[in-house]
Structures are given as C-alpha cells and as structure tokens.
C-alpha cells in the first residue's frame, strides 16, 4: 500500500513540475504590490501570468481551475496506463525456455559386445562358443573402453577368426590391459578346457553329411555279418578273400550254392575262340 502511495505522489509531482516555475520579475512585482485576497475572489484569465514566463515556485492556491483540471486529467491518464500495464503483465504467459538442441552432435557409435546402462555406464559382454552363455567382462566409463575389452576377450577365445571392433589395434598388441585379472583367469581356463568347442564338432559332421548326400555309417558291415557266417582270412601273398564253403551256414542254405550254378558265366573264353580260327 505504501509503495502505491509513493508511486501516485511521484506522478503527481511530475504533473505539477511545469506549473511550479514562475519568472523572478513577476514574483518580485507581485510581492511589491500585493493584492488583497477574499474568499469570493476568483482571478480572471487576464490576471494569470502565462506559464512560459514563470520561473519560481508558487503555491497550489495560485493555480487556475483550467490548470487544476489539466493536472487531474493527466493524473487520470497515467493511472489508467499503469493499470493496463499491470494487467497485461499478469495475462501474458511467461515464455518457456526451449531446450537447446545441438545439431552438430554426432550419433553414438554402436560397438560389438557393448551396451549402455540407464545411468550412463557401458558394459562389455561376450558369448562363449561352447555353451553360448554370456560372460560379463566389466563396467566402463566410455564405449571405446568397453569395446576394447570385448576385443581382448574375443581375440583370446576365438583367435584370428574373431570379429573385432578395433582389429588393427588388438592384433598388433598395441593396447593396455583393460580386463581385470579375475576375468583374464576365467578366459584362460575356458580356452584351456577344450581345443575345439562341441558345437563346432557337430557342425563339421553335419557339413560332411550335406556334401556327401547321405549320412556316414559308423562301421562298414563285413561279408560274414551279412550272410551270418564267417570267412577265412586273406593270404599274405594276395588281397583276395577266400570263402569257407565247409562252414555250417553254407551247408544249411542250399540256395546259396544253387544260385551259383543257375546263371552262366559271362567271362570270354579266348582259348576256345582261337581254336575256331
């Protein structure tokens, strides 16, 4: 409330400032020839000095009604303007600051075996070739460190066949050891457990079956196993295997011998042909 009163007083004094100056000559002449003032006395416009000739301060009781009306009108206009400004300030919405979008920001590069936590850290993991389980390699501050940790583990497990994020750096060996000693020991034990992982062996057998068109038998059956009888061993001088016709299986199965005499031999007798000529 006190602040509003001070504001109105300041505006009132600013409005009275043009009328608070009178000329020195007029003030001295008025002081030398004072005029009696009565309650019914109203000065005329001819008796009022012009504003431009006033240079000294005078009392408010010496203002004309026209000047007082002008002062009231000016005060009223200033009050209306101040109220409008206050109302417009309350009605207008405050500008909200938009977030600055950096157009030049580069997108985050994705690395193999690396993922980001919700709080900003980077985690490196690798899948083991034997049982396809994940091995946690550690948490790092940057994505590059996590990618380098994955490369070190992958190069130890898979060798030169590993797909790396930084192949030139890892294969040349110009890098610092990022993996912890416990992770290194675990990777060494995994590498020493088996030379060739089990899934790779199964994959190799399946590849051979696809190329040949049929599955490879575990063991080729022998002649004696097919006909249910044994056979004599081969002589050391030749690789021809001789059948043992004296065995019980041949005697019992007479159809075996009858089949030999049923069909003629298809071999050419060259001696008989030479006798004809």
Curated annotation (Swiss-Prot):
Q: What is its main location?
A: nucleus
> What does the protein in this record do?
Probably acts as a transcriptional activator. Binds to the GCC-box pathogenesis-related promoter element. May be involved in the regulation of gene expression by stress factors and by components of stress signal transduction pathways.
Which residue ranges does the Swiss-Prot or TrEMBL entry mark as DNA-binding? 110-167
Q: Where does the record place it?
A: Nucleus
- List the protein's name: Ethylene-responsive transcription factor ERF057
State the source organism's domain of life. Answer: Eukaryota
**Name of the gene this protein is made from:** ERF057
What GO MF terms are annotated? DNA-binding transcription factor activity; transcription cis-regulatory region binding
Keywords for this protein: Activator, DNA-binding, Ethylene signaling pathway, Nucleus, Transcription, Transcription regulation
- CDD domains to which the protein is assigned, alphabetical: AP2
Entry GO terms, CC: nucleus
State the species of origin: Arabidopsis thaliana (Mouse-ear cress)
Could you tell me which PROSITE patterns the record lists for this protein?
Answer: AP2_ERF (PS51032)
Q: Into which family does the record put it?
A: Belongs to the AP2/ERF transcription factor family. ERF subfamily.
- State the PANTHER family in the record: ETHYLENE-RESPONSIVE TRANSCRIPTION FACTOR ERF057, ETHYLENE-RESPONSIVE TRANSCRIPTION FACTOR ERF061
Q: Name one GO biological process term.
A: ethylene-activated signaling pathway
């Amino acid at each position: 409330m006190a602040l509003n009163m001070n504001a109105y007083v300041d505006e009132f004094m600013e409005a009275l400032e043009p009328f608070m100056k009178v000329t020195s000559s007029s003030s001295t002449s008025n002081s030398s020839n004072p005029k009696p003032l009565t309650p019914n006395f109203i000065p005329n416009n001819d008796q009022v000095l012009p504003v431009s000739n006033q240079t000294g301060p005078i009392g408010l009781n010496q203002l004309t009604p026209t000047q007082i009306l002008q002062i009231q009108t000016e005060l009223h206009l200033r009050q209306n303007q101040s109220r409008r400004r206050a109302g417009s300030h309350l009605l207008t919405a405050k500008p909200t600051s938009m977030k600055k979008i950096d157009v030049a920001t580069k997108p985050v590069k994705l690395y193999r075996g690396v993922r980001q936590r919700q709080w900003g850290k980077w985690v490196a993991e690798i899948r083991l070739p034997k049982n396809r389980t994940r091995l946690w390699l550690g948490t790092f501050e940057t994505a590059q460190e996590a990618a380098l940790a994955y490369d070190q583990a992958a190069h130890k497990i898979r060798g030169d066949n590993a797909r790396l994020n930084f192949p030139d750096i890892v294969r040349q060996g110009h890098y610092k050891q990022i993996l912890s000693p416990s992770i290194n020991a675990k990777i060494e034990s995994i590498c020493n457990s088996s030379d060739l992982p089990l899934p790779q062996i199964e994959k190799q057998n399946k590849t051979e079956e696809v190329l040949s068109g049929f599955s490879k038998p575990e063991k080729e059956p022998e002649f004696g196993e097919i006909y249910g009888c044994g056979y004599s061993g081969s002589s050391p001088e030749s690789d021809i295997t001789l059948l043992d016709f004296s065995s019980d299986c041949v005697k019992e199965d007479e159809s075996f011998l009858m089949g030999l005499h049923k069909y003629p031999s298809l071999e050419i007798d060259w001696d008989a042909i030479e006798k004809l000529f």
